[in-house]
Structures are given as structure tokens and as C-alpha cells.
């Protein structure tokens, strides 16, 4: 976990000052987004990776898709846009401990976005997902990103390379089943409703996925740059405390 804290802190801090649109290149471009998270992966539900456990298959391959209802990056409006990331862990390793060594990480930016909005979405994705630091095998693609809600089913389509359909599962006491503050939680995943996919297909990044009845998660979010700055600071404090404890134990 030591390596994880160091990598995540560096990964999330950098986008707070880099990647700003031309007229927003300052040390503290502030941003805020509100919307919904659609997420699915190859693991059986619920995905154990959020508990720093190994995936239920040889690898965990999955996505995070942000549908922004309202947002801005500095003066750049992001209302109605979307951004997604697909990634996969190495075999027999957790997503958390293998961060930086993932088999691949691919960002998908809403093609509706203009050039300034694309740069803004890329910067936010790097902070929130954080996608471009997860793997040396990284690329960004501009595609249509859509969602249809058909009864209980949420159908998400990423260009012509990916689609998945998910639905929530009922909790034992009624209502939807929710997971709150798992060990791997970040501001985006402070709480999410648990579900399962009907089907998940992905044909890009040298992959050919076609799975059914796997992990699906649905969340709502209101995120901003101040929140992530505090999150990074918190990771740094945890790292310092951990190093101090380990140093004392060696004496």
C-alpha cells in the first residue's frame, strides 16, 4: 500500500495544475462537476478490488463513465458532456496495488466537446479517474458517449467499441443495495449502489470482452478541485503516518 499512496498522490496532484485550456493556465484552475457514475467490470458483484482484494477472474477489466449534468473547468462549461475510462489489471494482482502497471488504460472523451472542453475533460479525468497514470499503455479517443434508461436497465454505449447494460440489485431489507466508504474509496466512490450487468462488451485496446452477470455500480457525484486537493493531502498524511510507524517498528 505504500507504493499506492505515493503513486496516487502524485497522479492526482499533477492534473490540478496541468492540462488547463489555453486561457485557464494557472496554478489553481478550479473545477466542479455534478452528475452520475456508471461503472462495470469483469468481477463478480460486488467487485473485491475496492476492498484491496484480488479480482474474481484472473484480471479485473472494467470502466468508469462520468455523465456530467452540470460542470465547469475555470470558465469552460461542461454541461451535458461525458468522459470514460477503460482499464485492466495484470493477472493475479489487485487494481490498487498494480496501479501504474495496468495492462492498459484508455480514455474516451465525448466527441461533442469542443477543443477547450476536451482539454478540460482530459484534465478532470486525470484527477478523478485517474486514468493516464494507471498504465504506460495509455491513449485518448474521442467518441460519442450515450446512455439510455429503459426501466431498470441502464444502457451505456461508447462509440462503436463498447456497450454495457446494468441494473441495481435489491438489498436484504428492501431498497437498493449500497456500499459506503470501502477501503479503496475516493470522493467519486464515497458511496454507490450495487448491481449486476446483463451484458458487457468491449472491443478496443487489444481486448475482446463479452461478459454477462458481472459487477455493476451506479453513483451520483458532486466533485470539485478543492475536494480532490484535500483528498491528495489526506493520502500524503496517511503515507507519512505509515512510514513513521514502519520506521519505529524497525528500531
Feature map (PLM): residue ranges:
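Positively charged n-region of N-terminal signal peptides that target proteins for export
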Residues: 1-5
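Bacterial N-terminal signal peptides
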Residues: 7-15
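Cleaved targeting-peptide boundary
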Residues: 17-30
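Beta-strand-enriched cores of mature, soluble protein domains
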Residues: 27-250
